[in-house]
């Protein structure tokens, strides 16, 4: 028993020398490094560094305008003046830029027509009365054809008024109403003259507009 106690007492110093004390992980090991990683305070930035950072901000991200500038709107006169200046052409038009025309082109010539179409529609409206007038007026698209139809219908109206007035087959149509006879007679005469006069004016248009810029002509029948 005494020998066992003596052996145990001899082994304890040797084992105690091999142990190592461990640190607690929750305790901070190096507080100096944590303090070193923190950013410096604003008071430590010098005046030159502050000016440098202000310059960088102004160049990359410009500051917005002040409240007075942002909320100031132009007056009504200024807005109208700006709108007027925007509509003014940069290069004003000049008359010499347009090229004169020696004669009407094919489309204008088709729109005006010729004497043959005028005479054809004139006799159609004169011989076939209102049926010939509607056919010749609707089937032709030229001014000569339509003016010929109007003139022929006017002469046809005069023809039938004279037939009814002086014929023995239609007695009593205008008894006591001679003003109505005169109204239809004057109306037919005006239609006849209008067709001839307007067609004569249209025929002179190629000569009138030969030296003028290109112009659209609207025929009102």
Swiss-Prot record:
Modification comment: Ubiquitinated by NEDD4; mono-, di- and polyubiquitinated forms are detected. Ubiquitination regulates its degradation.
Induction: Up-regulated after traumatic brain injury in surviving neurons around the lesion site.
Region (Disordered): 18-44
Residue ranges, Extracellular side: 138-143, 194-221
Example of a GO MF term: WW domain binding
A Pfam family matched in the record: NEDD4_Bsd2
Residue window of motif PPxY motif 1: 39-42
Region (Interaction with UBE2L3): 2-41
Stretches of the chain found on the membrane's Cytoplasmic side: 2-116, 165-172
Lipid bilayer topology: Multi-pass membrane protein
GO biological process: CD4-positive, alpha-beta T cell proliferation; intracellular iron ion homeostasis; metal ion transport; negative regulation of CD4-positive, alpha-beta T cell proliferation; negative regulation of inflammatory response; negative regulation of interleukin-4 production; negative regulation of isotype switching to IgE isotypes; negative regulation of protein transport
Summary of subunit composition and partner proteins: Forms heterodimers with NDFIP2. Interacts with several E3 ubiquitin-protein ligases, including ITCH, NEDD4, NEDD4L and WWP2. The interaction with NEDD4, NEDD4L and ITCH leads to relocalization of these proteins to exosomes and eventually to exosomal secretion. Interacts with U2SURP. Interacts with SLC11A2/DMT1. Interacts with PTEN. May interact with phosphorylated EGFR. Interacts with BRAT1. Interacts with KCNH2. Interacts with MAVS. Part of a complex containing ITCH, NDFIP1 and MAP3K7. Interacts (via N-terminus) with UBE2L3; the interaction mediates recruitment of UBE2L3 to ITCH.
Protein name stated in the entry: NEDD4 family-interacting protein 1
Species per Swiss-Prot/TrEMBL record: Mus musculus (Mouse)
């Amino acid at each position: 028993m005494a020998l066992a106690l003596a052996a145990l007492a001899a082994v304890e110093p040797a084992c105690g020398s091999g142990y190592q004390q461990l640190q607690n992980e929750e305790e901070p090991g190096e507080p100096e490094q944590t303090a070193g990683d923190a950013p410096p305070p604003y008071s430590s930035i010098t005046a030159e560094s502050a000016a440098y950072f202000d310059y960088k901000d102004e160049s990359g991200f410009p500051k917005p305008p002040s409240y007075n500038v942002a909320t100031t709107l132009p007056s009504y006169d200024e807005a109208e003046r700006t709108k007027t200046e925007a509509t003014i052409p940069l290069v004003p038009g000049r008359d010499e830029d347009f090229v004169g025309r020696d004669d009407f082109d094919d489309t204008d010539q088709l729109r005006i027509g010729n004497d043959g179409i005028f005479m054809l529609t004139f006799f159609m409206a004169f011989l076939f009365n209102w049926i010939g007038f509607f056919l010749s007026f609707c089937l032709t698209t030229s001014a000569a054809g339509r003016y010929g139809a109007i003139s022929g219908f006017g002469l046809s109206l005069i023809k039938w008024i004279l037939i009814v007035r002086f014929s023995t087959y239609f007695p009593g149509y205008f008894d006591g109403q001679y003003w109505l006879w005169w109204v239809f007679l004057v109306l037919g005469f005006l239609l006849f003259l209008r067709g001839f006069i307007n067609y004569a004016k249209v025929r002179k248009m190629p000569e009138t507009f030969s030296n003028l810029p290109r112009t659209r002509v609207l025929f009102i029948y």
